[in-house]
Amino acid sequence: MSHEPEYRDWQQIVELIRSSVDSQQHEMLLTMLMTPDERESLTARVNILNELLKGELSQRQISQMLGVGIATITRGSNELKSKSEAEKDKLKLLLEQVAQVAK
């Protein structure tokens, strides 16, 4: 008897998260899926993308501000470069909206 994992691709994970948001269980799900270090890394990645999209600081300044390596900033920058302007605009708007709610 061979067993296969039920979750095999990224879209299934995205759907799991979407479903957890719909049922107000997203915080519980993400807390259970990610270690404290992973959550900290994800927070850093969000801040990296946010700062890169703002375009006000150099990669070195972002690295110093967030306490992450320059290679981490470069990976975020490379990921952004692979996206269309429309995708970047959507992400920037989403980040701005959430930042306004948090203030």
Swiss-Prot record:
Q: Which biological processes are named by the entry's GO terms?
A: negative regulation of DNA-templated transcription
Q: What Gene3D superfamilies does the annotation carry?
A: TrpR-like
Question: Any idea where this protein resides?
Answer: Cytoplasm
Q: Name one GO molecular function term.
A: sequence-specific DNA binding
State the source organism's domain of life.
Bacteria
- One GO CC annotation: cytoplasm
Q: Which residues bind DNA?
A: 59-82
One Pfam entry for this protein is Trp_repressor
Q: Which UniProt keywords apply?
A: Cytoplasm, DNA-binding, Repressor, Transcription, Transcription regulation
Q: Which family does it belong to?
A: Belongs to the TrpR family.
Role this protein plays: This protein is an aporepressor. When complexed with L-tryptophan it binds the operator region of the trp operon and prevents the initiation of transcription.
Assembly mode: Homodimer.
Per its record, how is this protein called by name?
Trp operon repressor homolog
* Species of origin: Vibrio parahaemolyticus serotype O3:K6 (strain RIMD 2210633)
Q: What is the lineage of its organism?
A: Bacteria, Pseudomonadati, Pseudomonadota, Gammaproteobacteria, Vibrionales
